[in-house]
Each structure stands twice: as C-alpha cells, then as structure tokens.
C-alpha cells in the first residue's frame, strides 16, 4: 500500500494556509491516492464542454458534484446530480449545478464541477478530525 505522507502533509498545509478547515473532494482524492486507497475515476471541469469530455472518457453513467471550499454540504446546495447518462445531460447538469451553487451561496468560490465515475455498492466515507 502506498504511503506518501509528504504529499498528504503538503495538501493539508495548503488547506490550512488558505484558512480552510476541510478538504475539497479533489483534495480528498489526492489524499486517497497518496495512501493507495482506490476511488472512482474522476476529474474536475471548468466548462460544460470539458465536463462532457471527461464523462465520455470514463463512460456513463457519471455523477456531477460542485467543487467549492465554501459549500461543504453539496447535496443540500443542489450541487450533486447522479445517474447522468449522456453528454447532453452532462452539459445541462453542469449549468444546473452552477446555478444551484450560486443560489445557495452567492459568495462561494466555485472551483469547477467534479465528474466522477458512478459505481454501485461500496461505502461513502467521511473522515473528520
């Protein structure tokens, strides 16, 4: 099993330096990668077209999630769409998620939309300290 503590320390130090107390989902994936913890395929897109390209590359269905250090509860903010099955749905979903996020928190810093391979089974894990 991988154990890259230096990478994890850099990630956590950068989060702390920015004044945050939680990781974004992509930062969490980097931590998982550093420790060899398998996670679904994913990427972050800043445009609807880029999101559709990511989704096509990993295969449908996918999950779309807002990426913002200011929105911790993505589902509550309308920032999650599951079972997205086509490029057209990805593009429409991208716009919907951004609109929902801005409505939920107008001042939120939006880093993009995470496109993630949809997998069945497993267990969602939230780690806190």
Name these PLM-found stretches.
Residues 1-129:
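ATP-dependent carboxylate/acyl-activation modules
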């Amino acid at each position: 099993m991988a154990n890259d503590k230096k990478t994890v320390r850099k990630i956590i130090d950068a989060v702390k330096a920015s004044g945050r107390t939680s990781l974004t989902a992509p930062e969490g994936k980097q931590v998982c990668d550093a420790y060899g913890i398998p996670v679904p395929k994913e990427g972050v897109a800043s445009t609807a077209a880029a999101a559709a390209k990511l989704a096509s590359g990993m295969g449908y269905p996918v999950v779309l999630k807002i990426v913002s250090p200011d929105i911790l509860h993505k589902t509550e903010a309308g920032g999650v769409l599951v079972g997205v099955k086509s490029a057209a749905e990805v593009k429409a979903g991208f716009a919907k998620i951004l609109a929902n996020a801005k409505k939920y928190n107008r001042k939120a810093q939006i880093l993009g939309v995470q496109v993630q391979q949809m997998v069945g089974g497993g267990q969602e894990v939230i780690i806190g300290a």
